[in-house]
Amino acid sequence: MIDAFFIAGTDTDVGKTVASKAVLQALAAKGLNTIGYKPVAAGSEKTEQGWRNSDALHLQKAATLEVAYEDVNPYALELPASPHIAAKHEQVEIEYDLLSEKLAQHKEQADVVLVEGAGGWRVPVSDTDSLSTWVQQEQLPVVLVVGIKLGCLSHALLTAEIIKADGLNLVGWIANRVNPGTEHYADIIEMLESRIDAPKLGEIPYIPSAKRKELGKYINVEPLLNID
């Protein structure tokens, strides 16, 4: 069984956090201790406790183990922009060593660590580097979240290709219906199933305020548990 994996998205706003919550809930239903980890988050709000990102808070709440917010989300950036822009605005350098240190800490505590990315696969974290470089460094298996909408086929297939070209193991994908009006839904799913060389872990229907709902029933985590 893998002890950590990375949740990637075909783009921003495709439902990575919704899918992450669903996976965490499904893992918890199997009796596993989990931690949700959001290394970098842009679009945070100032609170009495410090800067907080809503997606990271959802991960913190969905996990079975209690972890300090600063360990769930070491880089909570204010601007709702690409991480490299938000980091530059705050004069912050995103250090891979810190991300790795937190990941190692989480692995010691949990059976499974779910690491949620930011934006799409090649989202920059500096003028010269992307978060995917750190994922390669850690050799994290990847689960791809596909937001089902017009144009998602090309985005999904290209992202799946580049993940594998980066030398990483694509261990599954999740369909998240972000637009209830998307036509030809079944045809889109059929094409993704035939073209993505990884198991479909589930389909999450369009659900208003999905981040606040019980979603684990939509996910089959068995393929993840059977990976050495």
Curated annotation (Swiss-Prot):
Pathway: Cofactor biosynthesis; biotin biosynthesis; biotin from 7,8-diaminononanoate: step 1/2. It is an enzyme of class 6 (ligase). Its cofactor is Mg(2+). One of its GO terms (cellular component) is cytosol. The active site is at 38. Homodimer. This is ATP-dependent dethiobiotin synthetase BioD. It comes from Vibrio parahaemolyticus serotype O3:K6 (strain RIMD 2210633). The gene is bioD.
